[in-house]
Amino acid sequence: MEYDEYGVEYKNTIILLHGGGLAPWNFREEALQLKDKYHVIIPALDGHSRSDRDFTTIESNANEIISFIDEKCSGQVLMIGGLSLGGQILVEILSRRSDICKYAIIESALVFPMRTTYALIRPAFSLCYPLIRKHWFAKLQFTSLRIRKDYFDEYYRDSSAITRENMISFLRANSAYKLKNDIEKCTAKTLILVGGRESAIMRKSAETLHMKIPDSSLEILPGYHHGDLSINHSCLYVMKAMSLISN
């Protein structure tokens, strides 16, 4: 597994899982703020730029990260955070290993299957995938995602490096993911975040996670879009993480 690493001299480890179609730069600003106190690891998710594996399933990627934590971190870390696809992988990790982290931040994780979206992904991306490497199209897509302008070059580089099959695979997995009952065994103190301007199914997902995870709190962020917090407001993300850990 390929990953970026910060603060290697510190014992307490935080793992941050980026969103689908993005890369470790999603959480770079957070890592730079945390590295003077914590060991921060940002893996490249399967099927993404810099990854050494194709994407197969959310469950497989979750198992890979669990194995990494077992091998490199003695089976437990201080905190895991995840956005969108990374948030779904985090939910799956918590469902499979209830005590793998003491704290968790789940941001904008969809946990209800969207069957129509799932059915449309392959035909839609088979047609439009060649456009992804076009600079003008990438710019339009980037603008629609509301990502900070200074990330465009990295976004363009990394999204262009994703193969068509990998992109279809992780988008279909994202739209098909269903919450497992074992999430109720999670022992991590968990903060669940969703943007106030996200879709109704995203808010429903956040509310369901809050209901299912015993020691959890839910924050709906007024005026925020999908992924807005971790991508565009790193200082606030770190403040929320520190508050979660210290309280």
Locations of the language-model features?
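Conserved HGGG/HGGXW glycine-rich cap/lid loop of the alpha/beta-hydrolase fold
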Residues: 4-50
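Active-site loop/oxyanion-hole signature of alpha/beta-hydrolase fold enzymes
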Residues: 41-81
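Conserved alpha/beta-hydrolase catalytic His-Asp/Glu region
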Residues: 115-117, 132-184
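Short beta-strand/loop motif that positions the catalytic acidic residue
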Residues: 186, 192-194
